[in-house]
Amino acid sequence: MLKITKICLASSATSTAQRSIALTAPRAIDQKWRAAKGLPENPNAFGPLTNLPDYTYLDGRPTPLGANQKRRLIKQQEIATRIVELSGELEFAKQRHERLKANAESEKQRLIRSKLKPKGHFLLKK
Amino acid sequence: MSFSNLLMKSGLTVAVRDAQAAVLMTATRQGHTIRGKPPGVARSLEQRIREENVEDPEVVARINIGFPQLKESRSAQLKKRLEHLKSQRSDKQLEQLARSNKLIIDLDKVQRTYVKTTGQHDLRLVADHYGIFEHLFGSAYFVPRVPLNISYQLDGDSLAPVYNGNVIKPTEAAKAPQIDFDGLVDPITGQAAGQDTYWTLVASNPDAHYTNGTAECLHWFIANIPNGKVSEGQVLAEYLPPFPPRGVGYQRMVFVLYKQQARLDLGSYQLAAADYGNLEKRTFSTLDFYRQHQEQLTPAGLAFYQTNWDESLTQFYHDVLKIKEPVYEYDFPKPYLTDQKFFPLKQPFNLYMDKHRDQKQVNKEYLERKLAKTHPFEGPKKPLRYPNAHPIRDVPSWLRTEIRKERLGTGRVQDY
C-alpha cells in the first residue's frame, strides 16, 4: 500500500508541476526586485510616464487631462467613495453590536433587580 | 482512499508485483455506514435541547418569599419517634385490638399529622405543577406554613372542601366559603404567638380576566383579620363566585393568606358596592400588590381549586355581571373549495351546486321542506315500514336517489 501511495503522489506532483506553468508578461519581470524597491507589479499602471501629462505649454497653461488619465481619476474617486461607504457600514455594525449587547445586559439587570425580596431563612436572622 | 480510478489503475500493476493480495482486500469496506457520530460521542436529545434553550441561571433563579420553619434536630426527632414506637409496642390493649381485627386507625389524626409535617411541601409541589407561583408571583415561591381549611356549604349538611386543585362547580361555589385557619400560631416557631396577629386573605383567578392576559380577577379580599377570625376582618372586595365561560375548560381559583406585621391601611383597594359586578374594577395583580407591601406582608397559606362551566352561569352572566354570556368554540379551518366551473365533469350537479351555496341558506331550505311536510297538530308522518318496497316513479334519477336516501335516513339528511 505504501508503494501505491508513493507512485500516486509522484504522479500527482508531476501533473501539478506541468499544469502550473504560466507565461504572461508580468511574470517575465523581476518581481522580487520590484517589490523590494516598492514599485508596482505592472510598470505601465503607475509612474511618471503614466501619471504626468505628455506635454506642457510654455506659457504656463494647465494641460488638459487625457482620456485614460480621466478614467483613472474617476476610478480612484469611486474606489474612495466605496471605501468610505463600507467603512461607515462597518462602524455602524460595530456600534449596533455594542448597543444590542448593552441592551441585553440592561434587560438582564432589570429582570434581576425586579425580583422580589428574598425571605425564607433570612427571616431567622432578625 | 481518495485517488482517482486512473491513478489507481496505473499503479495497480506495480503494487500487485510487490504487495501481498491480503493488503488489497482491506481497502474496501462492506456493510452500511453509521451516519453522524457514534452514539457514545454524539449529543443526546436532552443535551441538544438544553444547548438550544439556553437559560441564564441568574434570571430564572427562584426566590423564597415565605416563612422558614424552626425544627428540632434530627437526633431529637429520631429519639421521639423511637420512644413512640417503643410505647406502641408495649401497649397490651393495642396488641389485643390488632390481634382481634378491631384496630381502627384514626384517619383524622393521620391527616392532621400529615398537614403538620409534609403536607405543606406537597402543596408547594402541586402548586408548582399547576403554575400557581409562576402566574401569581413570577419567579418567587413559598412553602405555605399555615394550613388553610376552606369549604363551601352545599345543600343540607354537605361541604365541598377545597383541597389542592380539586374540581368545584360554580353551582357549589355560589356563596362565600367558610375559612378556618389557626391564626394564633407563629408560622416560624409553631408556638403560640402571644400577641394579636393580623392576616390578609386574597382570592383571585389568574385565568378569568377577559381583557388583560397577565392580570387576575379579584374574587375576594379580606384584610386585617384578627387572630384568624375571618368574620371580623375588613372586607375590601365582596365574594364573587367563579364564572368560567363555556368552552375554555378549567380555571384556577387561588386563595393566598398573608401574615401582616401590624394593622395595615389597605383602603385604596376598597371595591365600591356599586362595582360588585364590574370586572374591570376587579383587575388585580398579586405580584404588584405583594411588591408594594412586601415589607409588611408575607405569604403564609395557600389553597386552590379548579372549576369549569355549568348551566347556572348563564343566569349569573345575565343578572350579576350584566353582560352577554361568552361562548368559546374551536374555529376549524374551512375546507378547501376550488373555483366553480361552468362544466364540472363527473360531478353530481345537485351536490356540486349546493357545495358553492351558502350553507345557512341550504339548511334553511331543508328546514322549510321538512316543515312543509309536517302537520301542525298531528306531527310528522310515520316513517314507511318497508321504505324500499314503495316504488319511486316519474322523477329524474338524481331525485330518485335523494328520495330513497331520505326515506332510509342516510345521506345528506344526517348533515342537518
Swiss-Prot record, chain A:
Compartments where located: Mitochondrion
Using the UniProt entry, state which stretch of residues is the transit peptide.
Answer: 1-28
Keywords of the record, alphabetical order, are: Mitochondrion, Ribonucleoprotein, Ribosomal protein, Transit peptide
Q: One GO MF term, please? A: structural constituent of ribosome
Keyword Transit peptide in the entry? The reply is yes
**Has the keyword Ribonucleoprotein been applied to this entry?**
yes
State where it is primarily located: mitochondrion
Superkingdom field: Eukaryota
* BP term (GO), one: translation
Pfam families (alphabetical): MRPL52 (PF18699)
How does this polypeptide assemble, per the annotation?
Component of the mitochondrial ribosome large subunit (39S) which comprises a 16S rRNA and about 50 distinct proteins.
What family does the entry list?
Belongs to the mitochondrion-specific ribosomal protein mL52 family.
For this entry, the protein name equals Large ribosomal subunit protein mL52
